[in-house]
UniProtKB/Swiss-Prot annotation:
Chain sites annotated for binding substrate: 52-55, 115, 120-122, 126
Protein name according to UniProt: Glutamyl-tRNA reductase
GO BP: protoporphyrinogen IX biosynthetic process from glutamate
Reaction catalysed by this enzyme: (S)-4-amino-5-oxopentanoate + tRNA(Glu) + NADP(+) = L-glutamyl-tRNA(Glu) + NADPH + H(+)
Length: 434
């Protein structure tokens, strides 16, 4: 069975390309079905898709594709067709990781070593969601199940035994730092949050600590926005929840806008921001777009009075704290390397399972036949001692027939290899019976 991880992330591609191959949550299950069909049929092929603002990754286990170029080209072709993105645009930015490299990558991703925010924990939850979705889609099997269960265990071990999460600057904290560079005080600003998911909740928590003048939450489902607004109000803030449709009329009211929705198209266009800036009499407005695909049209960045930041822009602020954790990174890498070797040993042992089953089936067939023969001998009154002698002798002869026949008929290097191997097999068998 071949393991393969193919992906694109914040280190290999800009957000302008990552957003073109992102998978909305509702599209992942049908995409998994299409991918498995593309990989030469569903039977025996396992797959999972991880899609976040910083990465899109496909994990596969298949005995159909060969490792290396064939698996890469096959999966690249599917990804290109599925998202209608030319393969020539994707290929330079994709990484293809077979076997142990795929295992190591999964362990590093879950442990936060491959994240823009080194040591962040959100990716572990996102990976668990991806595995749960793949399980519900019926695309997980023995190999990926084992890979991901060990991945979660390794992530727990890394976080428990190292300080990989210490000194971490989250994306949410980075957004606040940028706001503090633009405005003299966040406490005098009006803040708009668009969306009500986990990332917006994290951002809202960090901004709330700065006691902004007003916080408004805009969401497609107003009830969810109201819930977040109520939580912030409990911290003594002036809050309000509005519908997403009200954005056009109210955008000019806000000094800071933080957006992170699951929309596949921008929800804030250039024209809307131009009108807002005009109504603000050209007072500056800071916009943080944490969504992939992006919520704010990129052309907005050209406006003089708008400071627009994407997830890639926030990465520079985040990396300021990464150097402080290099000792923890070395510890984490050592743990991961050890666990990769353990998993690869398990994977290699899986290749002999069919042979073991075949041996067990053949042995059981011999046992049943000789046992039935012994019962017939006892039924006709034969001496039990003689029956046992005949039973044990027949079992010995039949079990040894295959190896002795091979030793007598093989030639050359094959025979020499068998001569070296067989005595060790029987010594092991003898020890195991004691």
């Amino acid at each position: 069975m071949q393991l393969l991880a193919i992906g694109i992330n914040h280190t290999t591609a800009p957000v302008s390309l990552r957003e073109r191959v992102a998978f909305p949550l509702e599209q992942i299950k049908p995409a998994l079905g299409a991918l498995r069909t593309h990989l030469a049929g569903r039977n025996g092929t396992e797959a999972a898709i991880l899609s976040t603002c910083n990465r899109t990754e496909i994990y596969c286990a298949t005995d159909i594709l060969k490792p290396g170029a064939e698996g890469f080209e096959h999966t690249l072709r599917w990804l290109s067709q599925h998202h209608n993105v030319p393969a020539s645009d994707l290929a330079p930015h994709l990484y293809s990781l077979p076997q142990s490299e795929a295992v190591r990558h999964a362990f590093r991703v879950a442990s936060g070593l491959d994240s823009m925010v080194l040591g962040e924990t959100q990716i572990l939850g996102q990976l668990k969601d991806a595995v749960r979705t793949a399980g519900e889609a019926g695309s997980l099997g023995t190999y990926l199940n084992q890979l991901f269960q060990r991945t979660f265990a390794v992530a727990k071990e890394v976080r428990g035994q190292t300080e990989i999460g210490a000194h971490s600057v989250s994306m949410a904290a980075a957004a606040v730092r940028l706001a503090q560079r633009i405005f003299e005080s966040v406490s005098t600003q009006r803040v708009l949050f668009i969306g009500a998911g986990e990332m917006i909740e994290l951002c809202a928590t960090h901004f709330a600590a700065q006691k902004p003048r007003q916080v408004v939450v805009a969401n497609r489902t107003v009830e969810r926005g109201e819930k977040l607004a109520e939580q912030l109000a409990e911290q003594g803030l002036t809050t309000q929840a509005i519908r997403l449709q009200e954005l056009g009329e109210r955008l000019h009211e806000f000094d800071i806008v933080v957006s992170c929705t699951a929309s596949s198209l921008p929800i804030i266009g250039l024209g809307a921001v131009e009108r807002a800036v005009k109504r603000r009499k050209h007072r500056p407005i800071m916009m943080v777009d944490l969504a992939v695909p992006r919520d704010v049209e990129p052309e907005v960045a050209r406006l003089d009075d708008v400071f627009l930041y994407t997830v890639d822009d926030l990465g520079a602020v985040v990396r300021e704290g990464n150097a402080l954790r290099q000792a923890a990174v070395a510890q984490a890498e050592a743990i991961i390397e050890s666990r990769v070797q353990n998993f690869m040993h398990w994977l290699e042992t899986r290749s002999v399972v069919p042979v073991i089953r075949e041996l067990q089936t053949a042995g059981e067939s011999i046992r049943q036949a000789e046992l039935e023969r012994a019962r017939r001998m006892l039924a006709r009154g034969d001496d039990p001692e003689a029956v046992l002698e005949a039973l044990s002798g027949a079992l010995t002869r039949k079990f040894l027939h295959g190896p002795t026949h091979a030793l007598n008929h093989m030639q050359g290097e094959d025979r020499e290899a068998l001569v070296r191997l067989v005595p060790g097999l029987f010594r092991q068998s003898s020890h195991s019976e004691r």
